[in-house]
Curated annotation (Swiss-Prot):
One of its GO terms (molecular function) is RNA endonuclease activity. Pfam families: YbeY. This is Endoribonuclease YbeY. InterPro entries: MetalPrtase_cat_dom_sf_prd (IPR023091), YbeY (IPR002036), YbeY_CS (IPR020549). It is found in: Cytoplasm. The gene is ybeY. Zn(2+) binds at H119, H123, H129.
Length: 158
């Protein structure tokens, strides 16, 4: 686990665009974000917006050309090189997709939420899974981070 997570000054804007009693607490979202951030990071700002299928599908279609809802979309903030700002970007997470995937993959819902937050944060930090080498590196780091939170390997069959 990120041993200095309490030292990171985190400004998390949690936006709930859907009513859902199964959503994790803001404290859980903050813990998962802090765990995904590098130990060297002093401060970070990001938005996590929890949405329904319609909003997820619209954004996924507009920005990725895929006309279906998805679990998490990451929108990294890229400041001009001469400007240092702690803004990482935005994560858009579709609650119904996360819930359905957890059920289909036989995973505890909280574990899958944690995985989606970690996965999205790694994208904001520049990680990707476009080719096999990148995917292997990212999945290895995700597994390490999710397991440090007390959950099982998210890529292992349950």
């Amino acid at each position: 686990m990120n041993t200095s997570q309490a030292e990171i000054e985190l400004d998390l804007d949690l936006q709930l665009a859907i009513e859902n009693s199964q959503l994790p607490s803001k404290q859980n979202f903050e813990l998962w974000v802090r765990t995904a951030l590098p130990k060297t990071m002093a401060e970070a700002e990001l938005t996590i917006r929890i949405v329904d299928e319609a909003e997820s599908q619209e954004l996924n279609s507009t920005y990725r050309g895929k006309d279906k809802p998805t679990n998490v979309l990451s929108f990294p903030f890229e400041a001009p090189p001469e400007i240092e700002i702690p803004l990482l970007g935005d994560l858009i997470i579709c609650a119904p997709v996360v819930e359905l995937e957890a059920l289909q993959q036989n995973k505890p819902l909280q574990a899958h939420w944690a995985h989606m937050v970690v996965h999205g944060c790694l994208h904001l930090l520049g990680y990707d899974h476009i080719n096999d080498a990148e995917a292997e590196e990212m999945e290895s780091l995700e597994t390490q981070l999710v397991e440090s939170l007390g959950f099982n390997n998210p890529y292992k069959e349950q």
